[in-house]
Every structure is written in C-alpha cells, then in structure tokens.
Amino acid sequence: MKSADKKKSEDFYKIFKPQLTPQKMLKMGVFGGSYFSDRIKEYPKSWFKNAKLSKTFDVEKNRFKVKAGLSRKEWVDKGWIHKEDPLGWFQWYCRFTNGRRIPHIDEIQIKRWKAFKRHVSAIKKNCENGDIHCRRKQRQAILQWAYNPFI
C-alpha cells in the first residue's frame, strides 16, 4: 500500500467512533432480532447474553417497536452488500469490532456510517430533548448504526 493510501485509510479509522457496541445494540433490540439467524458462532457468546433475538423478524424485538430500514433485496440493489460481509453493515461492524481489517471495505462502511449521522441531526432538530417517542423510526435506524438513540 502506498503511504498516501495508508494515510487515507488511517484517517478513516480515526473518525469511526461508534457510540454503541454490538453487544449493547443486540441487548437494546435491533433488526427485529433476526439479523444473524444461525450465524452467531463467530462472535463472543457474551454479546448474546440478554440479546433480543428471534428466528424471524419480530418488530417487538426492536427497541422502539417499529420497522426501520430497507429490505435485504433493496440493500443488494443499492450495492450495499459486499462479498466480505453478505449480511451487510452490522456484520461488518461486528467483525471490525473483533479486530478484522479490510481497508477498502472499512473505508466504504465508515463513510456510510458517517453519512448516517444526518438522522441524528434530524432528531435533534425536530424533537424535544428527551422525547423518545418523537421520530421512533429514525431512532431505531440510528440505533442500528451504533448511534445513541436517546438524544
């Protein structure tokens, strides 16, 4: 890797500061509890203690009891699924948290994470401080991107 490319990748790593760990997200309730289906063996068992899990999507497993996000088909159609992480962003984040680094994929996913922060700004702009019932769909979405939904 050229030194300029290496510097660019290192800069992306510096800006990536998620507010929630995968374990905390799973405990709070994300992706209708069905994100991993049967693919949890590669992750620490501790992540799944008190996690809200389901074999199929169950909106009641989500922290805000709403469906937030697009379908898997839409993820594929938009080019958001990469062969390294066929389940998408959260799978990448879990593997990243466990130490895996693939610079070109990391850069793509960190850019996507950073761009999602616009939803945090929308909640702050449109909701009274502490009103967790305001914009529940956006709150669920930012939770699924490792941002604190209780802003």
Model regions: which residues?
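Compositionally biased, intrinsically disordered low-complexity regions enriched for acidic
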Residues: M1-E84, G88, R100, R118-A141
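Hydrophobic transmembrane alpha-helix bundles
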Residues: F96, N126, W145-Y147
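Short linear, low-complexity motifs centered on an aromatic residue
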Residues: F96-V120
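Eukaryote-biased recognition of C-terminal alpha-helical segments
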Residues: Q138-A146, F150-I151
